[in-house]
Amino acid sequence: MSESNSIAPAPAPAPVADENEALARSVILIVDDNAQNVELLQAYLEALPCRIVTAFDGIQAMKYIDDPDQAKPDLILLDVMMPKMSGFEVCQKIKEDPATRSIPIMMVTALNELGDIERGVEAGTDDFLTKPVNKLELITRVKSLLRVRHLKRELDRTMAYIEDIENRAQKNEPGGPVG
């Protein structure tokens, strides 16, 4: 094949970052109406290189999430029993919106009945942790949810890359595979 007919490969997606690098880019939103609970969760998560942002009710949380000038959180730690808007309502709103539905939500609450857990799952929560919170359990679950979040992002980027290559190959455009 002559040089003028060769097709240059499309640039590959960026390599997968290591876990600490991914954690350092992560934003965790803590939503709880009790300032002491917020401070405790912040103190527990200090060991992680994440950026922590807070909201003290569901309406404040939704304003942060919907603000185009703010980075979307990579994880939300959400209390259930709050004034103005319950955690169940916040969770449901987030999961109904295509722009935010992939954000993992961990409900962190004093509610511990099976019906409460079921209601959380029905609202769309990804995890459910009862208070009082164990620091090691919290950190382990947070790392796990963030790992899944970042792997999904990598998968989405790779799938977009593959789709781009397939589209270029079908149109015989530069950047598609040589064949």
Model-flagged regions — what are they?
Residues M1-L29, Q42, Q70, R153, ...:
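Non-catalytic signal-transmission and effector/linker regions of two-component phosphorelay proteins
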Residues V27, A35-I59:
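Two-component/phosphorelay signaling modules centered on CheY-like receiver
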Residues T54-L75:
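Acidic, metal-coordinating helix/loop segments flanking the phosphotransfer/catalytic sites
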Residues D79, T109:
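Active-site residues of response regulator receiver
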Residues M82:
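Receiver (REC) domain active-site loop signature in two-component systems and cognate sites
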Residues V133-V142, L146, H150:
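C-terminal output helix
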